Swiss-Prot record:
Organism name: Xylella fastidiosa (strain Temecula1 / ATCC 700964)
EC number: 3.1.21.7
Binding site for Mg(2+): 50, 118
GO MF assignments: deoxyribonuclease V activity; magnesium ion binding; RNA endonuclease activity, producing 5'-phosphomonoesters; single-stranded RNA binding
Source organism phylogeny: Bacteria, Pseudomonadati, Pseudomonadota, Gammaproteobacteria, Lysobacterales
PANTHER family, per database record: ENDONUCLEASE V
Protein name: Endonuclease V
Subcellular location: Cytoplasm
Site entry (Interaction with target DNA), positions: 88
One cellular component term from this protein's GO annotations in UniProt: cytoplasm
Family to which this protein belongs: Belongs to the endonuclease V family.
Length: 239
């Protein structure tokens, strides 16, 4: 899949933390929280993305998977490595991880109808977590799936599988706490771009297969967390 120049995406950023936060606030105003029309039908392809680090953080490793939306069959896997461009700064994860994620996206042979990213969407201090930033610059419908809360308040969901409660930030709902597996902490689900709050929840639920993580980010997480792994060869496309 081709995308615009990664350098051009960051051209407006001068590298400072203050400017990055200002850009986040500006970009957050462009986020669309309505479903892309093709989500109302039956998307055929899903993608999942996650990031890990090697060499004591000097190398960013991004994993991408492409899946059949109907049966969650794995079609492609890719891992790319790029030099880490900035240190970890709370709330600015997307500026650190996005270059590698965009490189991983270019490896996909087809455009996914819906993307899951390991991280937050609008459940973020400035409503622009990694999933929202990724969705905005790629113009792809995107959902953030995070393992821990970053902002907001919620009532702990019930212990049964599928129980969920809204996450509120300053009185506005920004996501869901979802009990994706019994005896596990809830996931933090939030829309990134071109996905409604309702669809962010229902699509995540559709992709659960007995594990805590939905299948797209579970598979990407497995790839991104393998230390010292060489670039993963593609699985043959079965569509």
């Amino acid at each position: 899949m081709k995308i615009s120049s990664i350098d051009s995406i960051f051209a407006a950023w001068d590298g400072s933390i203050t400017e990055a936060r200002r850009l986040q606030s500006d970009m957050a105003e462009r986020i669309v929280l309505k479903d892309e029309p093709n989500l109302l039908s039956e998307p055929t392809l899903l993608a999942g993305f996650d990031v890990g680090f090697e060499d004591e953080g000097r190398t960013t490793r991004a994993a991408a998977v492409l899946m059949n939306a109907g049966d969650l069959r794995l079609l492609e896997t890719h891992v790319v490595r790029v030099p880490t461009s900035m240190p970890y700064v709370p709330g600015l994860l997307s500026f650190r991880e996005l270059p590698a994620l965009l490189q991983a996206l270019t490896q996909l042979s087809r455009i996914p109808a819906l993307v899951f990213v390991d991280g937050h969407g609008i459940a973020h201090p400035r409503r622009l977590g990694i999933a929202a930033h990724f969705g905005l610059v790629t113009n792809l419908p995107c959902i953030g799936v995070a393992k821990k809360r970053l902002v907001g308040d919620f009532v702990e969901p019930g212990t049964a599988f599928g129980e969920h409660t809204p996450i509120l930030l300053h009185g506005t709902q920004v996501g869901w706490a979802l009990r994706s597996k019994m005896h596990c902490k809830p996931l933090i689900i939030s829309p990134g771009h071109k996905v409604s709050l309702h669809s962010a929840l229902t699509w995540t639920q559709r992709c659960l297969t007995g594990y805590r993580l939905p299948e797209p980010t579970r598979q990407a997480d497995r790839l991104a967390s393998r230390r010292g792994q060489k670039i993963v060869s593609d699985l043959p496309s079965l569509l």
